[in-house]
Every structure is written in C-alpha cells, then in structure tokens.
Design a protein with these regions (language model features):
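Broad, structure-driven detector of short, well-ordered beta-strand segments within folded domains
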Residues: 142-150
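Intrinsically disordered, low-complexity repeat and linker tracts
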Residues: 149-173
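Beta-strand secondary-structure signal
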Residues: 28-30, 39-43, 56, 113-115, ...
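Tryptophan-paired
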Residues: 51-140, 169-173
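Short, low-hydrophobicity acidic/polar segments
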Residues: 1-37
Length: 173
C-alpha cells in the first residue's frame, strides 16, 4: 500500500479472513485494528526567528512510506522529507511543533536519523538540528522537545509525555 504523495498519515489495519455468505443474510464480524505507524514529534521550546519561512524535516533509517499489510511493516526503506510552510510572526508568543508519521521495517527500531532545517524566504539555512539513533516503535509516539532555533553546543535530553501511548523514548534537549 502506497500513501498519496508518499506522505504517511496515522492509520490502522487488520489482516484476517472475513466470512462471506450468499443471500441476504446479514453477517456480523468483529475486526480489531492495529496502528501501523510510528509517530515522531519535534517541539520547539524557543521562538523561531522572524525570518523563518519553511522547515524541512528528513527521516531516514529503517523506515519508509510503503506499507506491506501481510507483514505489518514497511515494505522498503526510503528517506522521507516533509516541508512545512511557516508564518514566523504567528509563533512569536508560542512555540511550534511538527508531527510526522512513518512506517518501520520492524516493531522497534533505534537507527532512525532525523534532520530539521529552518530556512528563510530566500531558502538560506537559518538553523539545522540533527538527531541520530532516534528510537521509534510502531503504534507509539516519540517526542523530542527543546530549543530548536537557539540550542547550545551541549544538549541534554529528558522524557516528555505524548498524547498517543508513549514509546518511552521521548527526549528533551
């Protein structure tokens, strides 16, 4: 299964036999759906510069956008790039967050690399942050929270509580 424009959205699925009978007899079947995606959320604790126009987030590693319903995993690895248009003036009193969904090649992966790049209207890079060995789990959300635009050279991480059942691998930098 391929997502439109290769943009993975929150989704659930099932793989089971369904009983089909002829005639007009009604058939009831209970279907239990499983969430097939992993969610990554990047939350800024600082205010973005007024010159910010776009944010590009790239995810790579054991993830992708093509779903194999017979295995419940990503069919093939692919680098995922999402671009977000921003109105910096609207975020001067509150921070921003970006949420991305991805399919994984296994239930629990630890080799995900994420790059977030803020650019101005002339496509010049304002700030880039990189995260290696991001831990994602199918059906869970991992949130990274910290100063995206003004982070210091040394970064520390702490856990943040997500709305979707937490993966246990959230970090604060």
């Amino acid at each position: 299964m391929t997502f439109a424009n290769n943009i993975v959205r929150d989704m659930a699925y099932t793989l089971q036999d369904i009983k089909v009978e002829s005639g007009s007899k009604a058939v009831t079947q209970n279907v239990s759906l499983k969430r097939a995606v992993s969610c990554f959320e990047l939350r800024a604790t600082d205010i973005m510069p007024l010159t910010t126009k776009t944010q590009e987030i790239t995810i790579s590693g054991n993830c992708g956008t093509v779903f194999n319903p017979s295995t419940g995993f990503c069919k093939e690895k692919a680098t995922i790039t999402r671009n977000f248009s921003l109105v910096a003036k609207a975020h001067q009193e509150r921070s921003i967050h970006s949420t991305l969904y991805t399919l994984l090649t296994d239930k629990d992966v630890t080799d995900i690399h994420i790059t977030a790049t803020a650019k101005d209207k002339e496509e010049k890079v304002i700030k880039t942050v990189n995260f290696d060995n991001v831990h994602l789990v199918i059906g869970k959300k991992t949130t990274y929270t910290g100063p995206i635009f003004t982070y210091p050279n040394n970064i520390s991480f702490t856990v943040n509580q997500p709305e979707i059942p937490e993966s246990g691998y959230d970090k604060k930098f």
